[in-house]
C-alpha cells in the first residue's frame, strides 16, 4: 500500500483498558462520517513502514477513537504503537477532511486578500474577506454566484461578482 493513497487520521496517544485497545487522537481537520465502515487501519512505524491492522471493534469517546485490533488481546501487545501515526484508505468516505478556511488566501480580479473569519449561516459557509489596499472587510457566501474555484491544496479561493457585497 502506497502512503500517498492513505489519509492520515491521527495518532495513537495511549492504550485503553487491559484487553489491547488503543486510543487514537484524531487530527483537528478529520471528521468521522461512518464509524461502522472502518474495518482496516494502517499504523506507520518509526521506519515509515505501513502496517495494516484489522479492526475488531471501534467506538468514539469525545474526540478520540477507541480501537480493538483483531490480533491484539492484551495491553502489552499494543504498547509499542503509542505515538505512532494512524492512516486509513478512505475508499468508503468513513472520514472526511474539514478545511479551516481562515488559513486561505483570496484572489479577485488580480487583487489578493485573505480570509479573516468564517461562519455558517445555516445554509452556506461564509468567509469574511479583506482585500489588499482596502480598509473594510466584507462577508462572501461560498456559493457558485461568488466563487470561481476553491483550491484546498493551495488554499486559495478565487472569487467573482463580489462588487455588490463590498
UniProtKB/Swiss-Prot annotation:
Protein family: Belongs to the RimM family.
InterPro entries assigned to the protein according to its UniProt record, in alphabetical order: RimM (IPR011961), RimM_N (IPR002676), RimM_N_sf (IPR036976), Transl_B-barrel_sf (IPR009000)
MF terms in GO: ribosome binding
Lineage, opening ranks: Bacteria, Bacillati, Mycoplasmatota, Mollicutes, Entomoplasmatales
Organism this protein belongs to: Mesoplasma florum (strain ATCC 33453 / NBRC 100688 / NCTC 11704 / L1) (Acholeplasma florum)
GO cellular component, one term: cytoplasm
Biological role stated in the UniProt entry: An accessory protein needed during the final step in the assembly of 30S ribosomal subunit, possibly for assembly of the head region. Essential for efficient processing of 16S rRNA. May be needed both before and after RbfA during the maturation of 16S rRNA. It has affinity for free ribosomal 30S subunits but not for 70S ribosomes.
Annotated signal peptide: none
Keywords, comma-separated and alphabetical: Chaperone, Cytoplasm, Ribosome biogenesis, rRNA processing
Residue intervals of the PRC barrel domain: 90-165
Domain remarks in the Swiss-Prot or TrEMBL record: The PRC barrel domain binds ribosomal protein uS19.
Keyword RNA-binding: no
PANTHER family membership: RIBOSOME MATURATION FACTOR RIMM
The protein's assembly and partners: Binds ribosomal protein uS19.
Name this protein carries in UniProt: Ribosome maturation factor RimM
Pfam families reported in the protein's UniProt record: RimM
GO annotation terms (biological process): ribosomal small subunit biogenesis; rRNA processing
Keyword hit for rRNA processing: yes
Subcellular location: Cytoplasm
Amino acid at each position: 500500500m502506497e502512503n500517498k493513497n492513505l489519509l492520515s487520521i491521527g495518532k495513537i496517544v495511549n492504550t485503553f483498558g487491559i484487553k489491547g485497545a488503543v486510543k487514537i487522537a484524531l487530527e483537528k481537520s478529520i471528521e468521522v462520517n461512518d464509524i461502522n465502515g472502518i474495518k482496516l487501519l494502517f499504523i506507520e512505524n518509526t521506519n515509515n513502514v505501513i502496517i495494516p491492522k484489522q479492526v475488531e471493534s471501534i467506538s468514539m469517546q469525545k474526540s478520540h477513537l477507541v480501537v480493538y485490533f483483531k490480533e491484539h488481546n492484551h495491553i502489552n501487545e499494543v504498547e509499542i504503537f503509542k505515538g505512532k501515526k494512524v492512516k486509513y484508505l478512505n475508499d468508503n468516505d468513513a472520514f472526511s477532511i474539514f478545511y479551516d478556511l481562515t488559513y486561505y488566501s483570496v484572489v479577485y480580479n488580480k487583487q489578493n486578500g485573505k480570509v479573516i473569519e468564517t461562519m455558517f449561516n445555516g445554509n452556506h459557509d461564509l468567509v469574511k474577506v479583506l482585500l489588499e489596499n482596502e480598509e473594510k472587510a466584507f462577508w462572501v457566501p461560498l456559493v457558485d454566484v461568488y466563487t470561481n474555484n476553491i483550491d484546498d491544496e493551495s488554499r486559495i479561493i478565487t472569487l467573482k461578482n463580489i462588487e455588490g457585497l463590498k
